[in-house]
């Protein structure tokens, strides 16, 4: 009988090994990274596509700074934010927006409209947790980071915001959200 926490332990061990190998500039770092991803593949194969495991994989992609897989981490986070936002932590909010979201925007893989939509969804998660008294300081801090990072993008220009929100308003003038 397989136990899912064996996979959690395995990913933790290999994540640490990847970090050590990268620090030592070892030639075999990719082998360890591939093994980390293989553990996730087996985890999904044996226990299904659980949202918590998707978030864990996304977080580990960022933790090992595997930028070629940032689009995958972005897609995993996006799916979980849409389907089960209650499990998203303050760290997840930061990783999704600051690392993968900024990467996707800078590389032209997403447009400002999607970036701003992500900002709104993640801000709502922060606000919800703050209102419920859950890790208020952490969510306040990450909201400040979101605001700062948004301001560093071309998406925060008055012209761009007016263009996006005018179109939304014109499509549905009764909905002011």
Task: Please give the residue ranges for each predicted region.
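Preference for long, solvent-exposed alpha-helical segments and helix-linker "stalks"
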Residues: 1-177
